[in-house]
Amino acid sequence: MRRPILDKLSLQRYNYVNELAVVITIQNVGGEKDMAKKIVVYHGSSKIKEKPIWGVGNPNNDYGLGFYCTESIELAKEWACSTETDGYANKYELDLSDLSVISLTSGEFNILNWLFILLENRKFRISGGIAKQAKEYIFDNFSVDYKSYDIIKGYRADDSYFSFATAF
């Protein structure tokens, strides 16, 4: 994700979350000729995030360093309260004009493309020859140039998915 995207995010409101438990709705703005798109996304956090800061976070997350959002306010609440503490589901509106978007959930990609991205970003130890061969095969046959896009829309691995990826 390139830094200018974060400047386009504007905090709309936030919801206080006091239970354990980011929605992307794409809307056409204007007439058919004006296909500018705005999306609403949520970011779960222990803090109110008026303006996201680039470069903060874990570079070993699924898609690397970035500001992770979701289409689901419920999922944002879950992310906000992952350690049995209260948190916030920050809501943002983002104008997609002039931004490049890759959707890993489109028919153009499959689960092995996503697995390539996980293998590239997550840190774990690969032991055994077959595991190393499998990783090499995925890198050779299912690589995706996702780093050149402003927005990556795709799956998010929780620990059970990552266990699958590690086992693979």
Predicted regions and their residues:
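Catalytic core of tubulin tyrosine ligase-like
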Residues: 90
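Short linear motifs at secondary-structure transitions and domain/linker junctions
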Residues: 41-47, 64-70, 165
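Short aromatic-glycine-(Arg/Gly/Cys) micro-motifs in beta-strand/loop hairpins
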Residues: 39-60
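Extended catalytic/binding region for NAD+/ADP-ribose chemistry, centered on the ART fold
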Residues: 58-83
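Conserved NAD+-utilizing ADP-ribose enzyme module
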Residues: 7, 13, 17-37, 61-62, ...
